[in-house]
């Protein structure tokens, strides 16, 4: 009974440990949510700054390299 003020059968310690566990779980969940938001933000940024211009350059290249098919008259001879 040394250092025991109230005989609560470790209820206070149990409650404190559960609070610590819940706080850790909450922090992990918040971190995961923030990480997912960061991934979406990076994707939107790359979509505007990298993927969009590359797509435009590719379409310009496609239109430049396009070869019209031969007319039917030329093929028949």
Curated annotation (Swiss-Prot):
- What ranges are annotated Virion surface (topological domains)? 1-15
**Which residue spans belong to the Intravirion compartment?**
37-77
Give the source's domain of life in one word.
Answer: Viruses
Query: Do the record's keywords include Transmembrane?
Result: yes
Name the chain's protein: Envelope small membrane protein
Record's subunit section: Homopentamer. Interacts with membrane protein M in the budding compartment of the host cell, which is located between endoplasmic reticulum and the Golgi complex. Interacts with Nucleoprotein.
Q: Membrane topology per the record?
A: Single-pass type III membrane protein
Can you tell me where the transmembrane regions are? 16-36
**Which organism's genome codes for this protein?**
Human coronavirus 229E
Any GO BP annotation:
viral budding from Golgi membrane
UniProt record similarity statement: Belongs to the alphacoronaviruses E protein family.
In the UniProt record, the gene name given for this protein reads E
Q: Which InterPro entries match?
A: E_protein_aCoV, E_protein_CoV
